[in-house]
Amino acid sequence: WRFVNVSDPNRRATIRANFEIANADALGNCSGERAKLYATLKLDGLDKAPVQLAVFSDTQTPQGHGLGSQTMPETLAYSVVGAIQTLWLAARTQGIGVGWVSILDPTNVARALDVPDAWQFIAYLCVGYPEEEHTDPELVRHGWQDRVGLSEFILER
């Protein structure tokens, strides 16, 4: 995994512009009440987060000497997601919030940050102290989606 601390204001502005385009496209895929609700969702982490991290998977890493990547190359990306989850949990223990911005064009993010071609974009994280604390997910709280029970995801065989 590769973490890029995006601190340069010009690069942040480029990421923000990328988000604006992708967000407008996403809004265009909604209609009626769903579009109104989408437009009200809190998507301002790119403007307020003091720390912004772009996270990539190095698809040509020499680390591990390719062990397991011939049969399951996707585990490189899964390892990155595991690192993100570990960072997220550690941050939360300190009262720090993490937001995953997924409304971005991955190719444009990689280009804006001038990373090697072998780096696959996985996540853009906004990190900072939250303005307010909640125990329920924001998308549930705002009516975007109902909470789904664990039984929907766990199968017994």
What do the predicted segments below correspond to?
Residues 123-157:
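C-terminal helix-cap and adjacent tail motif
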Residues 2-80:
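Glycine/small-residue-rich phosphate/adenosyl-binding loop
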Residues 24-30, 114-137:
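A glycine-rich helix N-cap at a beta->alpha junction
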Residues 53, 59-112:
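Small-aliphatic-rich amphipathic alpha-helix that forms the alpha element of a beta-alpha
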Residues 1-2, 123:
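Extracytoplasmic/periplasmic beta-strand context in beta-sandwich domains
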Residues 11, 61, 106, 129-132:
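Surface-exposed, flexible loop/turn segments at secondary-structure boundaries
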Residues 44-47, 115-117, 147:
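Solvent-exposed alpha-helices and their adjacent loops that cap or buttress functional pockets
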Residues 50-52, 98, 120-124:
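Structural motif
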